[in-house]
Amino acid sequence: VEIGDLLRRAAHRFADAPAVSCGDRTLTFTEFDHATDRLGNALLAKGLVPGDRVAVALPNGIDGLIAYYGIAKAGLVRVSLNTRDTAADHALRIQDSGSRAAIGESVSSPVPELTFNLDDLAKMIVDGPDGRCDVPRNAEAPYRLGYTGGTTGQPKGVILSMRSEHAEITSYLLDLLPDIGPGDTMLHAAPVTHASGSFFLPHLIRGAHNVLLPSFDPGQFLEELERVGASATFLVPTMMAMTLDHAGDTPLDVPRLRRVCYGASPIAPSLAERARHAFGEVLAQTYGQSEAPMAITLLRPDEHDRIGSAGRPYTMAEVRIVDDEDREVATGETGEVVVRGQILMSGYWNRPVETERTLRGSWLHTGDIGRFDEDGFLYLLDRQNDVIISGGFNVYPREVEDTLLEHPAIKEAAVVGIPHEKWGEAVEAVVSVREPIETDRVLDWLRGRLAGYKRPRVLHVHDTLPKSSAGKILRRAVRQQLRDSVNGREGA
């Protein structure tokens, strides 16, 4: 089923109902369908041909959504760019993807006449040729191209097909949001270029209303939750923490809210408990990655007595834990998380060697270290590349970070390994705080909470921690800062 078919069927069923809103502007299902037709037709009229890549860097807004689905209807491939990235980042991705056109304020195409700013986009949406835009696309052909967040190195283009898109929608409607329908409202507080965008089509095709916030502010988010009577929303853990800090950790009066979905980065158990207290039994954690978007495992609202788990596999995903030889390990044993199913990427753009390595044996090798318990719940320990080996023992930074975040004064934490002559690597931590701390007292506080080899030797206090454009703390950048500091002291 083509994207255009999904939009047209929704327009036929829910015609004049509100489909999408942002600020004072609302489009009905029919209006949204026709707007995406005009935009798709306009792009084809500019000389683009099906299969061409179109780079898009747009803020949350209705025109951005029209661009995404107009591009899809025209058989073009959307290259998703994050507006928080730099112009240099955008240029690198545009060059790497071979994009012929670009839409946004901080992007430019190699073909000047195919560079469109926000005003150009608005004009194409209004003045584009009327009529159905429906270019067929093979299920395995590229549908969109996303770039990994860059937390583990150079970002790579991830090719997602219509097959993957359908599997993601099906996963949500079967497992995460089976009861949505007309009268429901999804509040998008996170960028729709990121994980929140995954929730748009499932709500649209069921006749629900998608409401977008142009940007995230915790006070505005809480007001909008109540004003629109949101039934569902999505937050990354950083946004969740900001919201709870703003609300003062008191239970929130949002009776229509049935799902607070979260994911996209690890969450500390202490933060999940705070969120459960504030929002009630509506939390749903969804685990995925760029190569298998947001639909590997799910921790349902009624399973949050297992805070710390990433949940159980979605219906559309087969998940195993394997050793270094790709052999499945026994229940309870630790290894790499691998995934198989229709949700998977087709591969990395122009990177056949990395594609073969990551998708070997038809399984996506996630690079995440985890284990299953006897009830089939997955527990993620860390990223393979982030494991610290100190004195021959494996230290999982996430475990240490989660423990640090239990301290009431600590707001953010990153734990990394620093080269050490005796231990191979020494455990060090960087934190940002809500109030001043004495680092020696915090290190003493960790005694009894962590084994000696896991405890940081040094605790650094910084105003803020480096993050990716998606809000993930960049351990790689933290590690480099500390190593540069050590080298600077040694060279002084």
Give residue spans per PLM region.
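ANL superfamily adenylate-forming
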Residues: 107-139, 149, 154-155, 166, ...
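Conserved AMP-binding/adenylate-forming core of the ANL superfamily
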Residues: 3, 8, 16-61, 65-69, ...
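Conserved adenylate-forming
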Residues: 43-48, 132-140, 145-187, 203-208
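AMP-binding/adenylate-forming catalytic core of the ANL superfamily
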Residues: 85, 102, 233, 325, ...
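A short helix-loop-beta submotif of the ANL/AMP-binding
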Residues: 53, 59-79, 83-87, 96-101, ...
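Conserved AMP-binding/adenylation subdomain of ANL enzymes
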Residues: 166-185, 193-232, 246
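Gly/Ser/Thr-rich phosphate-binding loop
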Residues: 205, 230-235, 244-305, 318
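ATP-dependent adenylate-forming carboxylate-activation enzymes
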Residues: 58, 79-92, 106-108, 208-228, ...
